[in-house]
Amino acid sequence: SGVTREARERVVRFLSEVLNVEEYPLTVMDRPVESETCKIVENSYRATLLAFMDEWSRFAEKHGVDIVKVIQAIKVRPTHSNIMFPGPGIGGYCLPKDGALGQWGIRHLLKDEELNFPITTAAININDARGVHAAELTCDALAAMDKPVAGAAVLICGCSYREDVGDTRYSGSELIARRLAELAAVI
């Protein structure tokens, strides 16, 4: 999108040169606010789904349910093949911030003080706590082996914010490492 027709055309030309628009066609929106809303809604949706899966992974932890097996069974249905596995938190340069950024923009740029986003806010809070929970599980596992956290050598694998990506920005495992280091574990 762009604020004028010429701006939209220039954006399309530029993006067509740097993106594979054959495989990933561009969708041109009428206004920049629509383009930004697409991005923020998509990322807030995914963050909300991951927060939802956090609820069910905690249920599974407590009741001995193999959540991986459950998700694999659900994925058999073509309409449910995109269900996500819960992890130690959301990361990357978009998911952790976009829900809050959208709310900020609505209040400060669009001057709308009436709208509230309770689901998005809850998802942000749940996802922010997931890394701490993973660190607590690590502490519990060490305690079960009669090993104090202080001085325990802990290897953290899978440090990117999602599988098959080499980018570690705002990774959930970063919070785990910080929390365990605060408790004097050797990372």
Task: For the regions a language model picked out, list residue spans one by one.
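Structural/interface elements that position substrates and couple domains in central-metabolism enzymes
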Residues: 1-187
